[in-house]
From Swiss-Prot:
The lineage of its organism: Bacteria, Pseudomonadati, Pseudomonadota, Betaproteobacteria, Burkholderiales. PROSITE patterns: HSP70_1 (PS00297), HSP70_2 (PS00329), HSP70_3 (PS01036). This is Chaperone protein HscA homolog. The keyword ATP-binding applies. InterPro entries: ATPase_NBD (IPR043129), Heat_shock_70_CS (IPR018181), HSP70_C_sf (IPR029048), HSP70_peptide-bd_sf (IPR029047), Hsp_70_fam (IPR013126), ISC_FeS_clus_asmbl_HscA (IPR010236). Chaperone involved in the maturation of iron-sulfur cluster-containing proteins. Has a low intrinsic ATPase activity which is markedly stimulated by HscB. The gene is hscA. GO terms for molecular function: ATP binding; ATP hydrolysis activity; ATP-dependent protein folding chaperone; unfolded protein binding. Keywords: ATP-binding, Chaperone, Nucleotide-binding.
Length: 620
């Protein structure tokens, strides 16, 4: 008798066909790995039942190393070989690191554009290699849990990570032996864990307050489509700042000062413990050994809330900016997802609830929520959930464009554009007979190339010689789902094409991105004036070049008086071009254009006469 195979709808009847895929939160201080088990996402523990893996690697002689808790215990005794928080160095050069002399590492100077590296007893190590060690440790944990090889992983990155930092993360995954299914933004992963689990739709805010940074993302969920419509934050604000304020306040109340680095560290540690105590109680003890003496102070939650209220307000200011970018009011937000251990502070919970007029979603562990969301996405990308129809649309943190004549930026893809995306724009040549075009790809919010960041340069050659402005070159920008950029240029008539994949050797820090955004807002008026001046000068140069070329070729057809008038207009434009008045340059350019209209008509008539010379009416 034949037996029928029965399985749950949407699931394979063969359990061995299930692909093991995990989500990884590669964090600055701690990392986690999660997977969907028995229909629910959960973080995977190590052999001792611990979920968090400290993002620390210690290198030892003869190729030996310690990872995680074992390495963390050796930070003080072997600081030079114990590499901590290397996520901050991913995709960054040595010149991008603030005060490298204050860090215990022996940084290795490299070529301009090289990613920073550190000298250890086991040789020179890059942040990519260190991150790969952490990823490999998490991969082994997952494989031990399931007793089989992984199919792939989804890894989360900060929303502000640029091309170089994302590429460095992809390289680390490959080095760790992981099949990278996708990179997704951390707030997006958190939203997946909440929004999809609860079958919610609408507009949501993801409020992510970690130890060192604050990120806010505005997302729209509609029929399974998750779209990030705005991002923002403060890369110099986190739980550590709350610790610092509390430590300084406590020492002032005690009437003492922390002079040495050891005393300052002790005060910070005591402040953090006190802050964590105030999460669950109305008062907690600040206790530290300062200057060889034990000091103690009872701290009330109300005092802590009062002295740190300015920090909390800074997070809300960033939220307001993100809402403006999304063109939304706070009343449009259906729910708020809380991410990061610092959101456990009661004052944060109250402030967010009061701002949005709704209680934030906090039923998931804020330390784990990012990894859980990544696991859900990995589960679907591995094909284990055919019924899942989720689509993620992240956004670009800074505008992308190319340099045009005069050092101006022509934006192709604007900030907060959803990805993956592709945008194209047509350009032309500036000079007669131009057969090549240099493409300079830049990133930023300013109007001048000098104020933006250079990403790549390449050339399109083989353009047919034509009059200036006749050629048509289509420049196409494509950004994939991982946020990596490709740029191509194609001459339309011949099909000749050139392309570059933008993988800069190091990228922008969160601080630099935030600074570039702030400068873009603060200098908008100045940039508009500068752009108008440059555009006026470029048009003046084009008009002067065309006039000189025409005079050299056909100046003999001009009556002496008309030639003199044109020369006067040319001299006037040349003189005013050196001034800083865009409107005056425009006026002089238009005057020259009007003054050469009759000359242009005579040139056209001569050209027609030359073309018809020697031909009969019948032959035409």
């Amino acid at each position: 008798m034949a037996l029928l195979q029965i399985s749950e709808p949407g699931q394979s009847p063969n359990p061995h066909q299930r692909r093991i895929a995990v989500g990884i939160d590669l964090g600055t201080t701690h990392s986690l790995v999660a997977a969907v088990r028995n229909g629910a996402a959960e973080c995977l523990p190590d052999a001792e039942g611990r979920l968090l893996l400290p993002s620390v690697v210690r290198y030892l002689p003869q190729g030996r190393r310690q990872i995680g808790y074992a390495a963390m215990d050796s930070r003080s005794e072997d600081a030079a070989n114990t590499l901590v928080s290397v996520k901050r160095f991913m995709g960054r050069g040595l010149k991008d690191i603030d005060h490298p002399e204050r860090l215990p590492y022996a940084f290795v100077p490299g070529q301009e554009g090289d990613m920073v590296a550190m000298q250890t007893v086991d040789g020179v190590k890059s942040p990519v290699e260190v991150s790969a060690e952490i990823l490999a440790e998490l991969r082994h944990r997952a494989e031990d849990t399931f007793d089989e090889d992984l199919y792939g992983a989804v890894i989360t990155v900060p929303a502000y990570f640029d091309d170089a930092q994302r590429q460095a993360t992809k390289d680390a995954a490959r080095l760790a032996g992981l099949n990278l299914l996708r990179l997704i933004n951390e707030p997006t992963a958190a939203a997946i864990a909440y929004g999809l689990d609860n079958a919610s739709e609408g507009v949501y805010a993801v409020y992510d307050l970690g130890g060192g940074t604050f990120d806010i993302s505005i997302l729209r969920l509609t029929q399974g489509v998750f779209e990030v419509i705005a991002t923002g934050g403060d890369s110099a604000l986190g739980g550590d700042d709350y610790d610092a304020v509390l430590a300084e306040w406590a020492l002032q109340r005690l009437g003492i000062r922390a002079e040495s680095a050891q005393d300052k560290a002790a005060a910070r540690i005591a402040a953090r413990a006190c802050k964590e105590g105030l999460t669950a109680a109305e008062s907690a003890l600040f206790s530290a050994r300062i200057g060889g003496n034990e000091v103690r102070l009872d701290v009330l939650r109300g005092d802590f809330d009062a002295i740190t209220s300015a920090l909390t307000e800074r997070t809300l200011a960033a939220v307001r900016r993100a809402l403006r970018d999304a063109r939304l009011q706070r009343e449009d937000i259906q729910g708020v997802v809380m991410v990061g251990g610092s959101t456990r502070m009661p004052q944060i919970q109250r402030a967010v609830a009061a701002f949005f007029g709704t209680e934030p979603l906090n039923n998931l562990n804020p330390d784990e929520v990012v990894a859980l969301g990544a696991a859900i996405q990995a589960h679907q990308l591995a094909g284990n959930d055919p019924a899942g129809d989720m689509l993620l649309l992240d956004v670009i943190p800074l505008s992308l464009g190319i340099e045009t004549m005069g050092g101006l930026v022509e934006r192709i893809i604007s900030r907060n554009e959803t990805i993956p995306t592709a945008k194209a724009q047509d350009f032309t040549t500036y000079k007669d007979g131009q057969t090549a075009l240099a493409i300079h790809v830049v990133q930023g919010e300013r109007d001048l190339v000098a104020d933006c960041r250079s990403l790549a340069r390449f050339e399109l050659r083989g353009i047919p010689p034509m009059a200036a402005g006749a050629a048509r070159i289509r420049v196409t920008f494509t950004v994939d789902a991982d946020g990596l950029l490709g740029v191509s240029a194609r001459e339309q008539s011949t099909g000749v094409e050139a392309r570059v994949d933008v993988k800069p050797s190091y990228g922008l820090s969160d601080d630099q991105i935030a600074r570039m955004l702030q400068e873009g807002f603060a200098t908008a008026g100045e940039d508009m004036r500068a752009r108008a001046l440059v555009e006026a000068r470029v048009e003046a140069d084009r008009m002067l070049m065309a006039t000189r070329t025409a005079l050299e070729a056909d100046g003999d057809i001009l009556p002496p008086g008309e030639r003199q008038s044109i020369d006067v207009l040319v001299q006037a434009l040349e003189a005013v071009r050196e001034h800083e008045d865009a409107s005056a340059i425009d006026a002089a350019t238009q005057a020259l254009a009007r003054g050469t209209e009759a000359f242009a008509a005579r040139r056209m008539n001569r050209g027609i006469q030359q073309a018809l010379a020697g031909k009969s009416v019948q032959s035409l």
